[in-house]
């Protein structure tokens, strides 16, 4: 066993992620890309960090904010909607959230929206007055209604929100929307945005001051490198000096061009990191502008 994994429990960083669901696999993949590996326990709820003293807890997504607030975990990857729902609920009871979103992690994008039966003729939020709205996010919805100056009844449901209008338990719903297919299947249409959401890395407001502080800083730096490179490619090519300005204008989403040592063929050797899609059409456009020997390379890791 290495010295790092033999560290006492209080010096080990602990991260909570969803055990199953749409955020589970992307979260594990992101952390693995940061160089983390684990040994899973028999109950499959705890994963002991092997490459670094960073352990995983596999839990329900709605447990993650509370685990951070109570100091059980240092970090968690959770939907921003779940984080805000519990923060809003704590505010209503006069409690501080004790956690915050450290950064977005680039997946799990969705929208919390109001959706009404397809036969409704929607004119605006004034129609919500006196209506019953079913949702799994009562605190977010209540805050939103208050900001809109609308009095409506919030019907809290833990699941199957989309069938509430057909069952007669609500007039409309407030639910997460990704593709909209579930709404369409239940004869509902989205009409009003309540909040945009994505998966975030959440952490305690008070960061650890012991050995975990160094681990946290290292993990965040690695994660920034992974996220920056997720949609990036290294582009290499040769070009005459007179063509460089025109080529640079075709790369607005790229880092400044870096000149490499001359290869003796009279042309400049250049490279840059592109942070957008590098399509065949884009390569052909660069070629027409004077780029030669174009190569697109995947970059796995970077420390900026």
From Swiss-Prot:
Chain's role:
Catalyzes the condensation of ATP and 5-phosphoribose 1-diphosphate to form N'-(5'-phosphoribosyl)-ATP (PR-ATP). Has a crucial role in the pathway because the rate of histidine biosynthesis seems to be controlled primarily by regulation of HisG enzymatic activity.
Gene for this chain: hisG
Known activity regulation?
Feedback inhibited by histidine.
- Family (UniProt): Belongs to the ATP phosphoribosyltransferase family. Long subfamily.
- List the subcellular locations: Cytoplasm
Main subcellular location of this protein, as a coarse class: cytoplasm
What is the official name of this protein in its record? ATP phosphoribosyltransferase
Output the CDD domains linked to this UniProt entry. PBP2_HisGL2 (cd13592)
Query: What are the record keywords, sorted?
Result: Amino-acid biosynthesis, ATP-binding, Cytoplasm, Glycosyltransferase, Histidine biosynthesis, Magnesium, Metal-binding, Nucleotide-binding, Transferase
Please name the GO terms of the biological process aspect recorded for this protein, alphabetically.
Answer: L-histidine biosynthetic process
EC number(s) recorded for this UniProt protein: 2.4.2.17
- Asked if the record carries the keyword Oxidoreductase, the reply is no
Record has ATP-binding as a keyword: yes
Q: Name one GO cellular component term.
A: cytoplasm
Per the entry, which co-factors are needed?
Answer: Mg(2+)
